[in-house]
Amino acid sequence: MSWSLQPPSFLLCCLLLLFSPTGLAYVATRDNCCILDERFGSFCPTTCGIADFLSSYQTDVDNDLRTLEDILFRAENRTTEAKELIKAIQVYYNPDQPPKPGMIDSATQKSKKMVEEIVKYEALLLTHETSIRYLQEIYNSNNQKITNLKQKVAQLEAQCQEPCKDSVQIHDTTGKDCQEIANKGAKESGLYFIRPLKAKQQFLVYCEIDGSGNGWTVLQKRIDGSLDFKKNWIQYKEGFGHLSPTGTTEFWLGNEKIHLISMQSTIPYALRIQLKDWNGRTSTADYAMFRVGPESDKYRLTYAYFIGGDAGDAFDGYDFGDDPSDKFFTSHNGMQFSTWDNDNDKFEGNCAEQDGSGWWMNKCHAGHLNGVYHQGGTYSKSSTTNGFDDGIIWATWKSRWYSMKETTMKIIPFNRLSIGEGQQHHMGGSKQAGDV
């Protein structure tokens, strides 16, 4: 086919299609471009076929053009920014002027110092954060404690609104000693008031009453070492410690009270000493006609004889093997009472002061129930304050370096001792005051 054979109108249409804008200027359609000439209809695709082809791709071409225009716009902006940056560098940079000596090193050192300061402040910050958390925990704990205390105060205030009641049970029955109280029908051990014949007023004691009707008046008790027995003369005279309804506290009844009880009757008293070691084994020692003299005689201890008991007669002294006179100078019958501030012993020193107690000291002792409470029983010179056997000792039962766990001293009228307990009565050879 030759282009010279096409009609002018067809050529004009093709030129319009080729050179006209693809956007809004001209849109090719069958009506304005297609020439229905059978001579070319099936052989010349440059008429209606070209119009259909361009029409189908027109939208995509327009989108691509807009994308290219946007890319060109951004590139122009970046170019402008780069030019401005180059101008700024040219203003501050002088290629003809060399850098100052040490400028780079100085900047490096400043950078290092800044890093070190940052690290230091970060560590300090962490430390402060830890302290703040710790203080916050203390604050919260204290707040809880304050809340608990406020609750307890409120409870106490509520209790104080109620009438006061004595929670310690003191029995109503009274007598001159615990045996008289038992004779009046009392069957329960506990706290009772007694008034010995020469006493100006009644005082509280712990009575141990058994099923046979025996009423023991308790003079001393050691249980757990909770009470310090290093007291002065007045304290031993008046008594110290606490009396409990259950008999489970430590105390010394008082020398004046012991004197008033033991000297009041024509029927003499028997003294029983009860001991318990740290393995739970127990033993006793009984003494007949036990008495304690008045303060004017320094509360002198006397007894007639050792009745018996598997603990042995430590009050009669003990031969420790240190000196032939050990037994004589460690006996207790007829000895006056001594404390650290009132020395009445036979020793050139002060037995009560060196042993930290008050007792009927000789020079010094074989039986000592008011001594220092040594936990576990066994002790040594190195574990004591002055290097002496200052424990709760009973040398005829345990070594003088073995301290008892529990002790009790109690008295009862001599005629109330039970024959069935297996006590051995040694009526002969009784010791009187001053025999030692």
From Swiss-Prot:
Q: What is this protein called?
A: Fibrinogen gamma chain
Question: Glycans attached where?
Answer: N77
Q: Which GO terms describe its cellular component?
A: cell cortex; collagen-containing extracellular matrix; fibrinogen complex; synapse
Q: What quaternary structure, including any partners, is listed in this protein's UniProt entry?
A: Heterohexamer; disulfide linked. Contains 2 sets of 3 non-identical chains (alpha, beta and gamma). The 2 heterotrimers are in head to head conformation with the N-termini in a small central domain.
Instruction: Provide the cross-link position: Isoglutamyl lysine isopeptide (Gln-Lys) (interchain with K-431).
Output: Q423
**PTM summary:** Conversion of fibrinogen to fibrin is triggered by thrombin, which cleaves fibrinopeptides A and B from alpha and beta chains, and thus exposes the N-terminal polymerization sites responsible for the formation of the soft clot. The soft clot is converted into the hard clot by factor XIIIA which catalyzes the epsilon-(gamma-glutamyl)lysine cross-linking between gamma chains (stronger) and between alpha chains (weaker) of different monomers.
Out of the domains of life, which is the source?
Answer: Eukaryota
Q: Name one GO molecular function term.
A: metal ion binding
Does the record's keyword annotation contain Coiled coil? yes
| Organism whose genome encodes this protein | Mus musculus
Pfam families the UniProt entry points to: Fib_alpha, Fibrinogen_C
Gene Ontology BP, a term: adaptive immune response
Which residues, if any, are the signal sequence?
1-25
Q: Fibrinogen C-terminal domain: which residues?
A: 169-415
